[in-house]
Amino acid sequence: MTIRSLFALLPALASLGIPALGEEPRRIDLRTKAGVESVKGEWRWHDVTLVPVAGKNPDGSPNKTYNYEPRAMAADYDDSKWEVVAPETLKDRRSTGQICFCWYRTKVTLPPGVEGKRVFFQTVVDDYGEVWVDGKLPYKVGQAGGNVASGFNYPNRVELADPAPGKTYSLAVFGINGPISVTPTNWIFLGPTFLEIVDRDEK
């Protein structure tokens, strides 16, 4: 490819939300139609309901407690009947307010240009978020951030394993309204949400 033809491609790459060679930051904005289309994605949303279930006390005796539905973390979870969300509306408030939870789901297929790179998914959930990638939410004692919540309106930043052009990942973001103990007067929405492609020695 000649230098002239390379420069001719730059406007097309920009229109798709795909970072051009040497461009900083190298991000694909998942709150734009162009960005989502460039990774063959589609956002879907669903509210979460608390449901009563049988449980156990610490001594093993039975009690009544709560779980939630839908449990939509699996990579192959069928969300085909969920509401399809336009990327530009991810910033809009959703769910019921007060004590509430919800899911945002999409799949992303990595574009050319990720060879030898690291790829991160990052989002900010108003107010707390947990991020499942391909049905997994790894965590450990003392962990702050990554797949689990680390603070109020604080970014979740998760590295996508073994990136390669054409590889698809399932992303499921569990949104939590907060602070829970004050009975929040707001709702749930997504702040800046993107894929970031960085060199191997960057974080």
Predicted regions and their residues:
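Boundary at the C-terminal end of the N-terminal hydrophobic targeting segment
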Residues: 19-22
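Short beta-strands within extracellular/lumenal beta-sheet-rich domains
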Residues: 98-111, 154-157
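Aromatic-lined ligand-binding clefts that engage carbohydrates, nucleic acids, or primary amines
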Residues: 82, 108-138, 171-175
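Surface-exposed coil/turn segments at beta-strand junctions on protein surfaces, enriched
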Residues: 99, 114, 151-153, 162-166
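Bacterial N-terminal signal peptides
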Residues: 8-17
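Solvent-exposed beta-strand/loop surfaces of large extracellular or lumenal domains
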Residues: 133-156
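An acidic-aromatic loop/edge-strand motif
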Residues: 24-68, 82, 155-203
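Positively charged n-region of N-terminal signal peptides that target proteins for export
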Residues: 1-5
